[in-house]
UniProtKB/Swiss-Prot annotation:
Topology in membrane: Single-pass type I membrane protein
Cytoplasmic side: 322-1308
Protein role: Component of the EvC complex that positively regulates ciliary Hedgehog (Hh) signaling. Plays a critical role in bone formation and skeletal development. May be involved in early embryonic morphogenesis.
Intrachain disulfide bonds: none
Signal peptide: 1-26
Entry-listed glycosylation sites: N220
Protein name in the entry: Limbin
Coiled coil: 455-578, 636-800, 1001-1113
Lineage of source species: Eukaryota, Metazoa, Chordata, Craniata, Vertebrata
Side of membrane Extracellular, spans: 27-300
Transmembrane residue ranges: 301-321
Length: 1308
């Protein structure tokens, strides 16, 4: 108890007097009727006074039940009252461990809280709790049996006992008046310190809030009536508590009804299994009553209670001061020491994920020292998945750090070259750091949100599927009972037992499927966040570069050079990450292949020594039986000796099991301590080395050198760490195997000594001949030697199989093959994207930048994560196996329903007819059990590999399709804008034609005036056309000059082979010259391709500039035409409504905003022309407007008639053309289509990859369809990818011809 608590002792004592006063006043009948539910304490009995008012409304009480995980409570239990001043509370909890592990020990856990909490200690009970008129401070008491469930193999109970020390409780404190009662609810998770405690991760609290109104809560609410709280990590000895306020929604509960509000905790411990704890919490509605007061009795009770409380107060105060001061000081010192001990770091722990790596490595010792050999390989597979997930996280962190370093290095190089000032560099670096920090926070928040949502969704799906499974089981049991009504009792019992076994296996498979599906969902979420982070890093870089260009801090030429360097370095970064991933995959495959071999080796050794032990025990029994059969022992003597021998054998085996368990426990702790010490020391050494190398990285100016140093360092550290892991695994196996073999050999020797000494003496005492006994002992010795040799041979065979399996695994995951395959795919995708980009007609600088960013995003997600493919393979295998099993079950059910249809042969027909329904059902259930226990076949494994390959191909095709769609959408937007402008221009010409015709017909304009107007307008159009041609010529000349300068620069900077003299020294050998030329050819081709790409990008940008110039000119032209149309409309005095109808007729596809904008422009032209012609034009009179009003209205009809006539002419021409085409005799279209060229894309082979094949590009061609003049563009869809990277041996070719062909291919 802290000092504050000791100073508060008088307050506790004086509170007793205040309680007495409150008791007396509370009994005066102040409880009024209420129409709302009341929150009442546990154990408060309704009053039995006959003077009771009528019912005044329902109330709430907390039903009795089990507290958290503590002792059970009954209806006679006193309620737990809460004192507001108390800052600490004691929870006495008995926690049930998972899977049948019982913990009878009661733990008193001290948890300091910032708010009041429930107390189940002795001070929580009070005599006054029995008075029903105590309304103010009431407690939500929870009914919470804690149940644990592990995902995985959870249908079988684990033998033995364990203590995990995790306490999960839900409690509440009620406050407020009877009309507006509120409750403060707490959820508490305490990871207490025990011998087997472990750090918890991925904690998720799901709290039911159905029927409550919640406020002051930080949880995420779901649509299913839950709210979720999450915490990333909870260390041993720490507690995690959340609280919120709640009120009961009015009208939800009637009198006597209960509201169940359970809470569920899900977390991961060091075993990597997800554990669930569940506490029950219920609210019961109860009617409120009003007590009629008896004033005299209450007054007497008040004075008596006041005097008694005063005496007790002074007495208690004297006793506490006299006797409990020393105890309080000792308790305070103990609690301070306990709190300080909590703050001490655990041994062998470190930051940055090292502690998690150490925990994962500890699990290998747990697996090797496990007492269940059958679950070792399954646990090893789960450990491998967890390690792969951890490796993915490490690689992603490495990728992010490399990207940040590359950006900083590029800015530094730009500053050193003089293209960026140091002040701008510092400013941009600060902005990048801020953006990166915001991105990390966003990623973390999104990760937490996804994990909470996925966990809740998976839990709901699990609940639904398990309920459906239970319903199917009940239906199956009912059907079986119907079939077995006429069968015998024994047959019915056997079928019932078999059916329960089948249902258990089905539940186990269902839980495994759900766990695998949840694991896949989590892995996909991690992958999505990783890809999102990579794309956001690129987006931040490109956004900041565009911002710097816009602000003038970075010149466009420098930005272009910076982006080119960034793109080139990103290709190197992706190549480096592919190498890191392939190396990590190989090292982990080697590590777990070796671990699998170690587990099998340990199992083989245990099988051998167990076989020898069983042989020795059997020989002891055979020795007695042989003497009995020889007549040297009667039956009573044999039974007595057998009983004694079996007792000795059981005693020896029992002692062996106990010794093995105790010694393994000691060795387990010793191995973990040694392993953690060495691994942590190695991690610290590597971290110091990384820090020293990081200082050297800051002085590096070349990005290639930085990546090379990073690759060397990571490769060296990975190899060193894997070597240490392998050595520690082998050492742990040697120690455990030595311990196991020594104990088993000791037990075997004891059995042989028992046979040779004690049992021999007993037999000799009973008159057995020594020669006969000696002969049997010699035979047993030879039999034991032969058995030992046989078991050793079987062990060697299994070891050889394990070695072959490890070698095959390493061959399949060879880093060279994986890296080559990934490089080939990247080259292919690069060609695809370049081909798509080259098909674009025009792109602006900003659009080109956006396309480049999208290409980087596509290349950033071409890698394969380490964990997701393996997890996906497990899910697919489980799905295929389930589908196959369901199909077999259907066949068996059909056979039971119609047994005569199942059998084909006559013998089987007669046999099946003789069987009863019960026997058929029993055989069907046995077959189903056999199918459930059967392992996956090799065909299903191959099918899974094929499905994984198909999914990978689909992802790549989806990336290509998405990129192509973005390009097509961009070009379509440009074409759409041009089409809109052209439509508007055509509409204006139509309106001009109509207005001129009407003005000429109405003699408002003479022919000479019309000619003058048109000539003036024509001169303006010619001047506009001349300006456009001049601008086009200037742009093309500038582009040609730039291309020529670039070509000259490329030739000047080309490789030395272009600058060598034509004559070659006669003494130099031709082979040397050819070798030098061949070594420089690749550089020449790369430079040439880069020059071509730059030239193509420049031409695309130039085309965009020209299109923009033409669009601007065309817009000016439209403006001129609009000016003329508005002038003619003013002369004809066409109203605005009529002009709007005319525009809607000639522009039927235009939207309403476009028409209004065009009409507003025409109105403005009216004003302009009116201002120009104010001096010379005469104002039209009212009679003139009335005169021409009739043909104003006829304009609409005439324009519609002209458009309809033109449309009819086009329709007639199209119909005649169609009839002429149909009269011709043509070959079928399929026979006339001939595709030229052959193209296919790389085939991802399932075999080990060898020599790489060249990748041709799929082309497109145009053919004339049925000689109609229409062009049909045919894009050849490649065949299903045959991604075989094996190439047959090629013939040798002439060097010069091959070089010409390579240059021609580069030009193409």
């Amino acid at each position: 108890m802290d000092p504050s608590g000791s100073r508060g002792r008088p307050t506790w004592v004086l509170a007793g007097g205040l309680l007495a006063v409150a008791l007396a006043l509370g009994g005066r009948g102040c409880l009024g009727a209420s129409s709302r539910p009341r929150w009442r304490p546990l154990g408060a009995q309704p009053p039995r006074d006959p003077q009771v008012a009528p019912r005044s409304g329902p109330g709430l009480r907390i039903p009795p039940g089990r507290s958290g995980a503590g002792p059970e409570s009954s209806t006679q239990d006193l309620p737990c009252m809460i004192w507001p001043k108390v800052e600490c509370c004691h929870f006495k909890t008995a926690v049930e461990a998972p899977l049948g592990m019982k913990l009878d020990k009661k733990m008193e856990v001290f948890i300091p809280l910032s708010t009041s909490a429930a107390s189940s200690g002795p001070w929580a009970h009070s005599l006054f709790a029995f008075i029903p008129s105590w309304p103010k401070k009431n407690l939500f008491k929870r009914e919470s049996p804690i149940t644990h469930r592990l995902y995985g193999d959870i249908s079988r109970e684990v033998q033995g006992t364990s203590e995990n020390g995790v306490i999960f409780q839900k409690c509440a404190l009620v406050s407020g008046s009877s009309e507006a009662q509120t409750a403060r609810i707490w959820l508490l998770v305490n990871n207490t310190k025990t011998t087997s405690s472990a750090n918890l991760s991925e904690l998720l609290l799901l709290d039911s809030i159905a029927g409550l109104t919640i406020w002051d809560s930080v949880g995420n609410r779901t649509s299913e009536g839950f709210q979720a709280f999450s915490k990333k990590f909870l260390q041993v000895g720490d507690a995690f508590a959340v609280s919120y306020a709640a009120t009961l929604q009015a009208g939800d509960l009637g009198n006597g009804e209960s509201l169940k509000l359970p809470a569920q905790l899900t977390f991961q411990s060091s075993s990597r299994n997800r554990t669930q704890l569940k506490v029950l919490f219920s609210i019961t509605a109860e009617e409120n009553v009003t007590v009629l007061p008896h004033h005299g009795l209450h007054a007497a009770g008040f004075f008596i209670a006041f005097l008694l409380s005063l005496v007790l107060t002074w007495a208690a105060l004297f006793l506490m001061v006299r006797y409990q001061c020393l105890k309080g000081n000792m308790l305070t010192r103990h609690r301070v020491w306990q709190y300080e001990s909590k703050l001490e770091p655990l041994p062998f722990t470190s930051a940055d994920g090292v502690n998690e790596d150490l925990s994962l490595n500890d699990q290998m010792i747990d697996i090797l020292s496990s007492e269940d050999p059958g679950s070792m390989l399954q646990a090893l597979e789960e450990l491998e998945i967890a390690t792969l997930n951890r490796a993915d996280a490490d690689l992603e962190a490495c990728r992010t750090q490399i990207s940040k370093d590359i950006i900083a290095l590029l800015l530094k190089n730009l500053t050193s070259s003089g293209h960026l000032s140091p002040q701008v560099e510092r400013k941009m670096s600060a902005v990048f750091k801020k953006q990166f920090l915001l991105l990390e926070n966003e990623i973390q928040e999104e990760y937490d949100r996804k994990m909470v949502a996925l966990t809740a969704e998976c839990d709901l799906e699990t609940r639904k599927k398990m309920e459906n499974q239970y319903q199917r089981e009940m239906m199956a049991m009912e059907e079986a009972e119907e079939l077995l009504k006429r069968a015998g009792e024994r047959s019915a019992v056997e079928c019932s037992n078999l059916l329960r076994t089948l249902h258990g296996l089905e539940q186990e498979h269902l839980r495994k499927s759900l766990a695998l599906q949840q694991e896949e969902d989590f892995a996909k979420a991690h992958r999505q966040l990783a890809v999102f982070q990579r794309n956001e890093l690129h987006s931040i870089f490109f956004t900041q570069i565009k911002s710097a260009i816009f602000k003038g801090e970075l010149k466009p030429e420098a930005a272009k050079m910076l982006l080119q360097n960034y793109s080139k370095i990103q290709e190197n970064v992706e190549e480096l990450m592919d190498f890191f991933q392939a190396s990590k995959r190989y090292h982990l495959s080697k590590r777990f292949g070796h671990r699998e071999y170690l587990v099998q080796n340990l199992q083989s050794s245990e099988t051998r020594v167990q076989g020898l032990l069983s042989t020795a025990a059997a020989q002891l029994t055979h020795l007695i039986q042989k003497h009995e059969r020889a007549g040297y022992l009667d039956e009573d003597q044999m039974e007595m000796l057998l009983e004694r021998a079996q007792t000795e054998v059981f005693s020896i085996k029992q002692k062996l099991d106990n010794d093995l368990k105790q010694e393994k426990k000691k060795l387990h702790q010793k191995l973990i301590t040694k392993r953690r010490r060495e691994l942590l020391q190695k991690h610290r050494e590597q971290r110091r080395e990384q820090a020293s190398v990081g200082e050297a990285f800051r002085t590096v100016e070349d990005a290639g050198q930085y990546l090379h140093q990073k690759r060397s360092l990571m490769e060296e550290h990975g190899a060193t760490l894997e070597e240490l892991q392998e050595r520690l695994d082998q050492a742990a196996l040697d120690d455990l195997r030595t311990l196991t073999l020594s104990l088993f050999e000791k037990a075997t020797d004891e059995l042989r000594r028992l046979q040779n000494s004690a049992m021999t003496q007993e037999l000799l005492k009973r008159g057995v001949p020594w020669l006969f006994l000696q002969q049997i002992l010699e035979e047993h010795g030879k039999e034991m030697a032969a058995r030992a040799e046989q078991l050793e041979g079987e062990e060697r065979d299994r070891d050889q199989e394990g070695v072959q399996s490890v070698r095959q695994r390493l061959k399949d995951d060879a880093p060279e093959a994986v890296t080559e395959e990934q490089a080939e795919l990247r080259r292919w995708e690069h060609l695809i994207f370049m081909k798509l980009c080259s098909s674009v007609f025009s792109l602006s600088e900003e659009e080109l930048l956006r396309m480049r960013q999208e290409v980087h995003g596509c290349f950033a997600q071409m890698d394969r994560s380490l964990a997701l493919p393996k997890i996906r393979a497990r899910v697919l295998l489980q799905q295929f196996q389930t589908a196959w099993r369901e199909a077999e079950f259907v066949k068996l059910d059909q056979a039971v329903a119609a047994p005569e249809l199942q059998q084909q042969s006559k013998v089987r027909k007669s046999r099946s007819k003789s069987k009863s329904k019960g026997e058929l059902l029993k055989k069907c259930i046995e077959d189903k059990i056999h199918l459930c226990e059967e392992q996956a076949s090799e065909d299903l494994v191959e099918k899974v590999r094929g499905e994984l390959l198909r999914e990978r191909v689909q992802r790549m095709e989806a990336q290509e399709g998405g990129f192509a769609q973005s390009l097509v959408a961009l070009q379509f937007q440009k074409a759409s804008r041009v089409t809109e402008t052209l439509s508007a221009y055509t509409a204006l010409l139509s309106i001009q034609d109509l207005l001129l015709e009407e003005l000429s017909a109405s003699e408002m304009l003479t022919k000479s005036a019309c000619t003058q107007i048109l000539e003036s307008h024509s001169r303006e159009l010619q001047e506009l056309e001349r300006k456009l041609e001049d601008q086009l010529v200037q742009q093309e000349a500038a582009q040609q000059q730039q291309a020529l300068a670039s070509w000259q620069q490329w030739v000047a900077d080309g490789p030395g082979i272009l600058n060598e003299p034509g004559e070659v020294d006669s003494e130099r050998q031709v082979s040397t010259v050819l070798h030098q030329a061949l070594s420089k050819s690749q550089t020449l081709l790369e430079q040439h391709q880069q020059c071509l790409r730059e030239e193509q990008q420049n031409s695309v940008v130039l085309e965009d500039l020209l299109e923009n110039m033409e669009a601007d000119t065309f817009a000016t032209l439209c403006s001129q035409e609009l000016r003329l149309a508005s002038y003619l409309a003013r002369m004809a005095m066409v109203p605005g409504a009529t002009l709007r109808r005319l525009l809607s007729v000639v522009l039927p596809t235009a939207s309403q905003p476009q028409l209004l904008a065009l009409l507003d422009s025409a109105t403005e032209r009216h004003v302009d022309h009116a201002a120009e012609s104010d001096g010379g034009a005469e104002q039209a009179d009212v009679g003139r407007r009335r005169k021409h009003q009739s043909w104003w209205q006829a304009l609409d009809g005439k324009l519609r008639g002209d458009l309809i006539s033109r449309g009819l002419e086009k329709m007639l021409w199209a119909r005649k053309r169609k009839q002429s085409i149909l009269k011709k005799t043509c070959l079928p279209l399929r026979e006339r289509m001939i595709f030229s060229g052959k193209g296919s894309w790389p085939h991802l082979s399932l075999e080990p990859i060898g020599e790489l094949a060249p990748v041709p590009i799929v082309g497109a061609e145009t053919i004339d369809l049925l000689n109609t003049g229409e062009k049909l563009f045919i894009f050849r869809n490649p065949k299903e990818p045959e991604i075989s990277l094996h190439v047959p041996p090629r013939k040798k070719k002439n060097f010069l011809n091959a070089k010409k062909a390579m240059r021609a291919l580069g030009m193409d």
